[in-house]
Amino acid sequence: MQYMTIVAFLAATVAAGPQIRAYPSIDQITVAQANNACGNNMQVTCCNKVTNTPAGNAVGNGAGILNNLSLFDQCSKLDVNVLAIANGLLNKECQANAACCQNSGGSATGGLVNVALPCIALSSLI
């Protein structure tokens, strides 16, 4: 009886463990793999400008909350529908900074807290 309890416990532990994505490094990933890493509602983009400064708030200069956040600008969408690009390496198609951006615009105005963070660095998702 104890054997079955141990086997059931180990099976439950393995099933509840985090899912590990088997993506290669950012230098070896294809555009299709990058598109899969971005998921549904996001698209692979190539951004020319990245700002790595923390955003300020009422508690000091960011208080360490957003220190690892990068803001992307001057981004252009990579077309994944073209077969030649989908099979090519991402670093050949995007010489700048690859990011996953939301399909909606990154505009946030007129609210109490105006935050528009539509892009996430691809390297943080793989």
Curated annotation (Swiss-Prot):
Induction: Expression is positively regulated by the cAMP-protein kinase A (PKA) pathway and more specifically by the adenylate cyclase FAC1. In contrast, deletion of PKA catalytitic subunit CPK1 has no obvious effect on the expression of HYD1. One of its GO terms (cellular component) is fungal-type cell wall. It holds the Pfam family Hydrophobin. Its main location: secreted. InterPro entries: Hydrophobin. Disruption phenotype: Does not affect pathogenicity in a corn seedling infection assay nor the production of microconidia, but affects microconidial chain formation. Keywords: Cell wall, Disulfide bond, Secreted, Signal, Sporulation. It is found in: Secreted; Secreted, Cell wall. Disulfide bonds join C38-C100, C46-C94, C47-C75, C101-C119. Residues 1-16 form the signal peptide. GO terms for molecular function: structural constituent of cell wall. Belongs to the fungal hydrophobin family. Aerial growth, conidiation, and dispersal of filamentous fungi in the environment rely upon a capability of their secreting small amphipathic proteins called hydrophobins (HPBs) with low sequence identity. Class I can self-assemble into an outermost layer of rodlet bundles on aerial cell surfaces, conferring cellular hydrophobicity that supports fungal growth, development and dispersal; whereas Class II form highly ordered films at water-air interfaces through intermolecular interactions but contribute nothing to the rodlet structure. This is Class I hydrophobin 1.
